[in-house]
Design a protein with these regions (language model features):
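Accessory C-terminal segments flanking Radical SAM cores
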Residues: 134-251
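Short flanking/linker segments adjacent to small metal-binding domains or redox-active Cys/His motifs
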Residues: 4, 242-263
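Short, conserved beta-strand edge motifs with alternating hydrophobic and charged residues
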Residues: 99, 126-130, 177, 187-188
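Short amphipathic alpha-helical patches
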Residues: 48, 73-74, 112-113, 141, ...
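Short, intrinsically disordered/low-complexity patches at protein termini
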Residues: 39, 234-235, 259
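Radical SAM/AdoMet-radical enzyme domain recognition
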Residues: 1-7, 11, 15-128
Length: 263
């Protein structure tokens, strides 16, 4: 069954009642962990209530540590707030992961600076290959080998994570150890190291539509089923069928692509 839930977006912390939702999920029997992916802008002020709700792990998106470039990429001048949120989360004992999308010809100069956070602090930094869905179709991404080569030129040769039993996360990230780092460097490489065979996720949009894969629009409208006052067995069977029919793999490398739904 489903035992781990991640609240993501968009930006979940701008949604009214997200703290109460997190609390409800944490208190649901069978749910072992609820985590949050955020841009970090409002995280610092919401940390106490999130921790009280039962959220003890956050992923914070950060594609540059240059203030001017951050404003260009996001449209907001909020880099300081994001950095304060990272430090505050660490001080509160939360598990922190920083996510950086590797953008070709855009943030290459920032990769080593963002990676340095894992050297100076007990957090993990993950570099994510750009997936050609939604706005990602118009952006060029860099592959894991390119990022890793640049990081090793600065910090020395990396080695695969020694302790494979370490509880680092629930997803497809593969972690590497760099000399002298407190944290690990992870790579989420959907393009160069296709991990579909090990994918254990389904996704629910803000409208209650459940999808088995980010790329494809196919899914189940759970909100409609709930409003139809169906019995629990109907909902369970709908989810079971959705998971059973989960696509074998994405088709990012082809032009034959269904309409994706990235929310």
């Amino acid at each position: 069954g489903i035992s781990r839930i991640k609240l993501t977006g968009g930006e979940p912390l701008v949604r009214k009642g997200v703290e109460k939702l997190a609390e409800m999920l944490c208190q649901t029997p069978g749910i072992e962990q609820v985590t949050l992916t955020t841009n970090g802008v409002f995280l610092k002020e919401k940390l106490p209530v999130l921790q009280q709700a039962g959220v003890h792990s956050v992923n914070i998106s950060l594609d540059t540590m240059d203030r001017e470039q951050y404003q260009k990429l996001t449209g907001t001048d909020c880099l300081l707030q994001v950095m304060e949120s990272i430090y505050a989360a660490l001080e509160q004992g939360m598990q922190v992961k920083v996510n950086c999308v590797a953008l070709k010809d855009q943030n290459e100069s920032q990769w080593s600076k963002i990676a340095a956070l894992a050297k100076s602090y007990p957090l993990d930094v993950r570099f994510i290959e750009m997936m050609p869905i939604g706005l990602g179709k118009s952006c060029l991404g860099s592959l894991q080998e390119t990022v890793q080569k640049k990081l090793e030129a600065v910090y020395g040769e990396a080695k695969p994570e020694a302790d494979l039993s370490a509880e680092r996360g629930n997803g497809p990230a593969v972690y590497w150890e760099f000399p002298g780092f407190q944290g690990k460097i992870g790579f989420i490489s959907a393009i160069s190291h296709k991990f579909c065979a090990d994918c254990n996720r389904i996704r629910m949009t803000a409208e209650g539509f459940v999808k088995p894969c980010l790329q494809f629009a196919k899914g189940v409208d759970m909100r409609a089923l709930l409003r139809g006052q169906n019995e629990d067995i109907v909902l369970k069977e709908a989810l079971k069928q959705l998971i059973y029919e989960k696509p074998r793999c994405h088709q990012f490398e082809t032009e034959d692509e269904d309409e994706s739904l990235e929310q």
